[in-house]
Amino acid sequence: MAGENRAPVTVIGLGAMGQALAGAFLAAGHPTTVWNRSAHKADALVARGAVRARTPAEAVKAGELVVVCVVDYEVSQAILEPLGAELAGRALVNLTSDTPERAREAAAWAAGRGIDYLDGAIMVPTPVIGSPQALLLYSGSRSVFEAYEATLKALGGNNRYLGADHGVAPLYDLALLNVFYSSMAAMVHSLALVGADGVTAKEFLPYIKEFFALLPAMADQVADGIDNRNYPGDLGNLTMEAAGVDHILETSEARGLDSGPLAAVRALMGRAIADGRGGDGFASVIEDIRKPVA
């Protein structure tokens, strides 16, 4: 049935993302069974043709492919552990966000019960689920990914299989979210900085967009430097860049703004300079990230 792209699917967990996943399966024509602790969250999906299971066990029995999306692995394991017998022989895809270590622990639990287990990470917000550009990362059971790749395409057209280690998809998830939250914090802080002098966010936003467009080319150089542990400072060294950060901090503090995130960056730069790397490029701070202060 998987090859026909109409495999019966079960979705456990109907938060905003779980509802989007179940809705995408329904839109693609998959018989879809849903379960959530708060049963009313299934109402809209049932109106679209989903079957509401009364219990997790009933939900699992209805699906050839079982997809879980809850708040963390503590919750997912609390739901799944009593269902080892029902899940045996089925394909389980866990799209819950958590640490690589917890994903590997869950994989070991599944392997001990004959459950074919694939871990995954959703890298888009709910409105993008089901679209060709929706990026989902998977790692773990290759057999599940290959057997149900067409089914999983209902969730997004940009699926990536990252290998047999169940911890890789969560690792990529957290690393990419690190980029996202750090960038968002920087953007919001910058808007607070210009806003303190009366510039609106809308006025300044075009300049942020132009500035972000410079980053991809810089990222290539950073990645090469990190892989080779070579951090040329010919285009800008840490000593020079630290002075620029000091100016930002001074300007922020003069306006009564919290400068915590940037102060942490400046402290990291200071450690690198103290270690004798003031002439290196910014990427050399990775050496200090790899040996955090006790």
PLM features: what roles do these ranges have?
Residues S97-L177, Y181:
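Rossmann-fold dinucleotide-binding core
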Residues T32, R52, D116-L118, N159, ...:
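Hydrophobic beta-strand scaffold residues
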Residues M1-V68, R90-A91:
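NAD(P)+-binding Rossmann beta1-loop-alpha1 motif at the extreme N-terminus of oxidoreductases
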Residues V168-A264, L268-V293:
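Helical "substrate-binding/catalytic lid" subdomain
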Residues P56-D116:
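Rossmann-fold NAD(P) dinucleotide-binding segment
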